[in-house]
Amino acid sequence: PDESFIYAESVDIRVFVQRFMYKRYDSENGTYVKTLMADDLNGDLKDNTGRLNCGKPAGYIQDFQALPDDMKALIKQIKRVRVLLGEVQLLNAVDAEGNEVDVDVHPFIWEVENKDAFKTMGQPFTMMAKQKRLPVQHWITCGSEERKLPTGASFFLPTATVDFTNSIDLTDGDQQKFADYIEWINNYNEYIVNAWNEKRAEKMSAEDAELVEDFIDIEVGGDD
């Protein structure tokens, strides 16, 4: 496959499916803990370590400060993720040497986990819902905005603008693409559920072993 890099200052995305999940980086093992993808974050979500919500307590936390320090530290590591699946086209794309290149529309998946970016990328969907429009009917133009840190360093956040003047007519091909994205999500969720079941079984086996070790051997003597 061609592994060359293509660059663009802005892109148009067409979102077919939006889902939500929790994610946390496990620095000890160098892996990510991820939950199921769901329509929202209102319920508890199984994760691939056999827990819920990447370790975050179930339900609403009434008093965060009352939690143990290790739990507070864990919760701060957990990110809300807005998962966008759809098509992307790069605008005025160039290669590493700055030469203009033509790039076909490509499928994409974007896990938006930065807190500010999570909010920014939610605004187009709120606007479309108010106008009773489907996300797949419009292109969202995404750019970037520089933000300064107190140290003088910079970081960038996405910007998002919806083109409401042009509406995309849905085709049979779009229906198939939508089905493909849903199938991908279902396969991902199946993997998470299987991992959850496996880890839960391991935990139960370990607990059973500890219980057996705690048993007291009782010998019943026979008649003399």
Regions inferred by a protein language model and the residue ranges of each:
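OB-fold ssDNA-binding interfaces and closely related basic DNA-contact patches used
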Residues: 1-102, 149-155, 163-169, 212-224
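Short helix-loop boundary/capping segments
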Residues: 91-131
